[in-house]
């Protein structure tokens, strides 16, 4: 593994000029493509489906992570099951609004994983362009806020023996951050980051 860490303004050899749509990076991921609130916001907006509709369509599933219940992309059945959003030609059908973990492939946050993609012809590209996330600095701040909130929730759950409250807390978190649309009721507009932070402040009061 290359242990050099990058900033989003750096150039890194991650772009596969000779990508032929093999789809290898979209198979066999089991339940590892974990989704955060921004991912659900993107998927819901892009596909025109609510959180519940995405689950009913078999696109999402829930998993337990140190006591916390969170969503992930539900791969098709089988050891090498494909992403449900992979098209028949081996291309991502939701590329413009794909989840954060998919965008990070080979860069993670932000270091380069050697041999993450076996295709030849890698060329350098600016990491911010590779990620393709608008307001990237704001997104990075949000990722940190969500990470530490989840860390605090898991720590809280680990120290509590109240299983009934743990269940209620998980249902509350799912409703506040995933089920409820990120829409301003007064005018129907959306400002994900401001709405997320309002909900984060609310959620922290119950810990």
Model-derived features: positions:
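Short loop/turn segments that flank or connect secondary-structure elements
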Residues: 1-207
């Amino acid at each position: 593994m290359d242990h050099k860490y990058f900033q989003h303004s750096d150039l890194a050899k991650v772009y596969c000029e000779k990508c032929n749509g093999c789809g290898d990076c979209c198979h066999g991921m089991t339940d590892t493509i974990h989704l955060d609130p921004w991912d659900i916001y993107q998927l819901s907006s892009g596909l025109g489906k609510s959180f519940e509709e995405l689950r009913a369509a078999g696109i999402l599933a829930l998993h337990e992570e140190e006591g916390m219940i969170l969503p992930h992309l539900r791969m098709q059945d089988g050891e090498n099951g494909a992403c449900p959003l992979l098209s028949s030609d081996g291309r991502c059908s939701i590329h413009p609004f794909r989840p954060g973990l998919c965008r990070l492939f080979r860069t993670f946050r932000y270091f380069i994983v050697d041999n993450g993609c076996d295709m030849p012809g890698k060329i350098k590209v600016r990491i911010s362009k590779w990620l393709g996330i608008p307001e990237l600095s704001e997104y990075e701040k949000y990722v940190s806020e969500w990470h530490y909130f989840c860390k605090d929730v898991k720590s809280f759950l680990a120290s509590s023996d109240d299983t009934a409250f743990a269940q209620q807390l998980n249902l509350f978190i799912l409703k506040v951050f995933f089920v409820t649309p990120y829409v301003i009721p007064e005018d129907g507009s959306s400002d994900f980051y401001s709405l997320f932070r309002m909900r984060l402040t609310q959620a922290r009061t119950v810990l």
